[in-house]
Amino acid sequence: MDASRASQLINSRETDVYCKSEPVIIRSVDEYSKMATVESLNNGTTIMAPLNDIRDSGVINH
């Protein structure tokens, strides 16, 4: 995922976002390092992940 798209999805629950197949919420994005802080929706843990590991489903939840 590119940094611009990741920034649009910060704290969003309207679009499903995944990091290595695990559902997450993007909490912050560092465009310089191309890393994002993500929180797991499964267990609440927060990790730093490369933007390349983050995908969105393209499905908007209402």
Curated annotation (Swiss-Prot):
Write the record's keywords in alphabetical order, separated by commas. Sporulation
Sorted alphabetically, the Gene Ontology cellular component annotations on this record are: endospore-forming forespore
Tell me, what's a Pfam family for it? SspH
Instruction: Please indicate if the UniProt record lists Membrane as a keyword.
Output: no
Query: Main site of residence?
Result: other
Q: Where is the protein localized?
A: Spore core
Which BP terms in the Gene Ontology apply to this protein?
asexual sporulation; sporulation resulting in formation of a cellular spore
The record's section on InterPro entries has: SASP_SspH
Q: Which HAMAP family match?
A: SspH (MF_00667)
Which NCBIfam families did the record assign?
SASP_H
Q: What family is this protein classified in?
A: Belongs to the SspH family.
* The protein, known as: Small, acid-soluble spore protein H 1
